[in-house]
Amino acid sequence: AQCYRKEGNYPKALEYYNKVEQAQPDSLNLALQIGQCLMALERYDEALAYFFKVEYLDKKPQNARRAIGWCSFITGNHQQAKKYYDLLISEPKPIMEDWMNAGHVYYILNETEKSIEYYRKAQELRGSHDEFVRLYQIDKKDLIKQGANEVDLFILPDELI
């Protein structure tokens, strides 16, 4: 399953993960991997079920929360995405992606000042403006699908300089 996943053959990886799941239904690591395959296949609602299971059962659910936040954002459930990214950035050491994705959510919710604040924190953790912009551009199509103004998306990174 992992070989297929690394090759990008998510349907085949999922087929094998599901077979392993029958033998190991309580494996949280397996549940995360199945959820990630489902995300790659854009089957977000199914993926969320796995991620919620991991969040509920795991002592350190940050990875599940990141996935829940992103699936929620992509499916237009921005309030739920906000809840999960707020949880992540309130942790002692949020990662750069937590700040960036929180920025995306707040931008879509028309809280531009907050989004700029969070993008700044992401940029600080990334170490350079150029590297931040490169990663920001990767998410541009997802932001547009969520209703972002394409012109704003070109201007927003300049606010961080």
What positions do the PLM features span?
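Terminal, low-structured helical/coil segments at or just beyond the last alpha-helical repeat
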Residues: L125-I161
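Conserved structural position within tetratricopeptide repeats
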Residues: K19-Q22, F52-Y56, D86-S90, Q123-E124
